Amino acid sequence: MLGLQIFTLLSIPTLLYTYEIEPLERTSTPPEKELGYWCTYANHCRFCWDCQDGICRNKAFKNHSPILENNYIANCSIYRRNDFCIYYITSIKPHKTYRTECPQHINHERHEADIRKWQKLLTYGFYLAGCILAVNYIRKRSLQTVMYLLVFLVISFLLSQLMLYGELEDKKHKIGSIPPKRELEHWCTHGKYCNFCWDCQNGICKNKAFKNHPPIGENDFIRYDCWTTHLPNKCSYEKIYKHFNTHIMECSQPTHFKWYDNLMKKQDIM
């Protein structure tokens, strides 16, 4: 009976720690606070653009260059469940569907603070359970029973601590201004204006990640210095231009969106 009480005491913080993100029913208008996420992946969806008089401006990224309204901008719907997000291109028959992984922890500092809070709770629970064992030993003098329970308690406590410390260890940032060559396709799908994606000579720039990308003229659009951050399940890049502008995406997200193909059919990417 005492062992069951101790196990329950140790399990409560772990159960409280787990949570699910809020579902989102199918809609063509994502919440404004989520536009940055959706428009990082589905940057051709109409909900990302404000089009007036044939000129379209990006709603999520205000410093994105205006583009001409064209067939590249498609009607889309989005849908979210606990462990995945989906967007549909409804302008095409049959509908094209893309599955992404939803951001679980946008604010990493808050996530780490939560983990440390549960570590403290587990520590206090360990002390409390130790007091219960001591009282039980004094009352019943059953040393063998107390030793079994103590071993069980220590093992449970260590496993819980290892799980949480491992979570923190995995969150260490890997930061650099130039991503590894093998990751260029991922970073240049999302951070296409970062200067590490382009090789510029004599005013002509070629894309390093996508060899079949048409050459473009050197201009301010591709002169941004970017810092990349690579976590186990999330990547972000910061565009350094007057002030830091951070964009977050999932590292495991497929990179073969070929965002430029349809756009280049209608206009220069400028």
Swiss-Prot record:
Glycans are attached at N75. It comes from the Viruses. GO terms for cellular component: membrane. It is found in: Membrane. Residues 27-117, 167-270 are extracellular. Induction: Expressed in the immediate early phase of the viral replicative cycle. Keywords: Early protein, Glycoprotein, Membrane, Repeat, Signal, Transmembrane, Transmembrane helix. The keyword Nucleus does not apply. This is Protein MGF 110-1L. It comes from African swine fever virus (strain Badajoz 1971 Vero-adapted) (Ba71V).
